[in-house]
């Protein structure tokens, strides 16, 4: 018997309130664990009930269908906490810790490595799954290991960096049915905290002035077809400002789709397809998304 048997998760919760895009239908069930034990208990509960379990993390990089999601949706935004060692550069962080918080804490301790991540709207766990990156940096450079548990339940175990098959905006965690519980980073100690603060402040300023920071979005929608830039390709097609329903290709940065106030997930999905079709017709390149779709026929 688990600690979840005496109670039920929340039913019929609108997932739009749990995503950075502010779209999505209701979850059949929603749980917000605040500890590792509670997270594992909810996963075991879903397995015992024979229902699907999906991790929505803190709701960034996700597009959830307007019809919502069956089974248990696991929101990890309350699973926060970190411990750092300013001497060795080791940082142990729970999966729901916001990336900007992690970057600031590391900088204050004189630990170099995560200054690039200051404006990323996600969590440590999500960064590991997506190999999040910005401004020339990426998670794979600094991540040492992750602690995971199978979505179908079972014992947690550790995966080292070399086991994660990191590539551009990719890790094996995107294919495996594993939930990231915590992560360990190995940063460079001994740096001047004031200088690191200056760099993080400059990086954040750059993001807020070149991206639609004040509007609901998922961050970058498309992966760059290296060495080309997705945003540049989209802008060259004159697609900035293109709107379907309440969803709009940002006039600030073309690789962002923003919710202007009343968007639905279907509007965003249609805009994504419009961009993909237009770029493929012009350049023969099919842009792939960074965002993960839940409840749709296709997850990418």
Swiss-Prot record:
Statement: the UniProt record of this protein carries the keyword rRNA-binding: no
Name the record gives this protein: UDP-N-acetylenolpyruvoylglucosamine reductase
Organism in which the protein naturally occurs: Synechococcus sp. (strain CC9605)
Keywords (A to Z) from UniProt: Cell cycle, Cell division, Cell shape, Cell wall biogenesis/degradation, Cytoplasm, FAD, Flavoprotein, NADP, Oxidoreductase, Peptidoglycan synthesis
GO cellular component, one term: cytosol
Domain spans labelled FAD-binding PCMH-type: 22-190
Higher taxonomy: Bacteria, Bacillati, Cyanobacteriota, Cyanophyceae, Synechococcales
Function: Cell wall formation.
Similarity comment: Belongs to the MurB family.
């Amino acid at each position: 018997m688990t600690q979840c048997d005496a109670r039920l998760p929340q039913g019929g919760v609108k997932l739009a309130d749990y995503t950075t895009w502010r779209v999505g239908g209701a979850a059949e069930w929603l749980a917000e664990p605040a500890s590792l034990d509670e997270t594992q208990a909810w996963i075991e509960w879903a397995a015992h009930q024979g229902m699907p379990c999906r991790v929505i993390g803190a709701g960034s990089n996700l597009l959830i269908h307007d019809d919502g999601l069956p089974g248990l949706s696991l929101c990890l935004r309350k699973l926060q906490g970190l411990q750092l060692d300013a001497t060795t550069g080791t940082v142990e962080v729970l999966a729901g810790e916001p990336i900007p918080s992690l970057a600031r804490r590391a900088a204050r301790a004189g630990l170099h490595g995560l200054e690039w991540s200051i404006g990323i709207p996600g969590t440590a766990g999500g960064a590991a799954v997506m190999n999040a990156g910005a401004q020339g940096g990426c998670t794979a450079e600094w991540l040492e290991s992750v602690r995971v548990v199978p979505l179908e339940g079972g014992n947690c175990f550790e995966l080292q960096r070399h086991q994660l098959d990191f590539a551009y905006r990719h890790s094996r965690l995107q294919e495996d049915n594993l939930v990231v519980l915590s992560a360990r980073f190995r940063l460079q100690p001994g740096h001047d905290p004031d200088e690191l603060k200056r760099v993080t402040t400059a990086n954040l300023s750059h993001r807020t002035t070149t991206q639609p920071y004040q509007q609901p979005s998922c961050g970058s929608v498309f992966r760059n077809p290296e060495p080309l830039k997705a945003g540049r390709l989209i802008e060259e097609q004159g697609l900035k400002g293109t709107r379907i329903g309440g969803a709009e290709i940002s006039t600030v940065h073309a690789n962002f789709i923003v919710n202007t106030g009343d968007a639905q997930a279907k509007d965003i999905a249609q805009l994504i397809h419009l961009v993909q079709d237009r770029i493929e017709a012009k350049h023969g390149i099919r842009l792939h998304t960074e965002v993960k779709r839940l409840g749709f026929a296709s997850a990418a």
